[in-house]
Curated annotation (Swiss-Prot):
It catalyses: orotidine 5'-phosphate + H(+) = UMP + CO2. Keywords: Decarboxylase, Lyase, Pyrimidine biosynthesis. Gene3D superfamilies: Aldolase class I. The active site is at K63 (proton donor). It comes from Allorhizobium ampelinum (strain ATCC BAA-846 / DSM 112012 / S4). GO terms for biological process: 'de novo' pyrimidine nucleobase biosynthetic process; 'de novo' UMP biosynthetic process. InterPro entries: Aldolase_TIM, OMPdecase, OMPdecase_AS, OMPdecase_bac, OMPdeCOase_dom, RibuloseP-bd_barrel. Catalyzes the decarboxylation of orotidine 5'-monophosphate (OMP) to uridine 5'-monophosphate (UMP). PROSITE patterns: OMPDECASE. This is Orotidine 5'-phosphate decarboxylase. One of its GO terms (cellular component) is cytosol. Disulfide bonds: none annotated. Pathway: Pyrimidine metabolism; UMP biosynthesis via de novo pathway; UMP from orotate: step 2/2. Substrate binds at residues 12, 34, 61-70, 116, 177, 186, 206-207.
Amino acid sequence: MDARNRLIVGLDVATVTEAEKLVSTLAEDVTFYKIGYQLAFAGGLEFARDLAQSGKKVFLDMKLLDIDNTVASAVENIVRMGMTMLTLHAYPKAMQAAVEAAQGSGLCLLGVTVLTSMDDQDLNDAGYQGDARSLVLKRAAQAKEKGMGGIVCSAQEAQAVRAILGSDMAIVTPGIRPAGSDAGDQKRVMTPADAIHAGSSHLVVGRPIVKADDPRAATQVILAEMQAAFT
């Protein structure tokens, strides 16, 4: 298994110019990129199309949630953009609408369970009863039932989630931090090797690469750790 197909670099930058520079710097070491709100609203959607047309894989992290018809219409347009992955919140009706809209397209739909920046207290403050792990597992089961391509969750829950999803669905894990690096605003973090061993199929890494003094060197260290974990 080639780790380059499983590392997703988060283009967490403010401008398309910065994103273009980073993609050029990382060259052939990276084949998969994530574009979220920050870049999307600064011309990043056109850039996402360009990346896909250049042969890169693009994970559009939009975390969709709306009425069924609106979600379905958005998914249909995103399919036409040539994206590889798309996130939506793991609510049953939204997932069902998205799956029906994406049918036959090859777009991998990912259900967002609980953000890796949140812990049990954050959920309690938001009015949820129970703990983050229980909610992640419940939403993972719902995502499987609705026919989603995978889910997004912390590597701390990946092993339990893998037992629910089986071997075919993707487990995409943000909050990845190489040993010794700053966790930043993430609360449920894990190293690349530990995340792979726990059952994650794809790792999303942003700041440890984007903010590194040498982004390409930082990427190569992470890829080597992932490759060793896969073998």
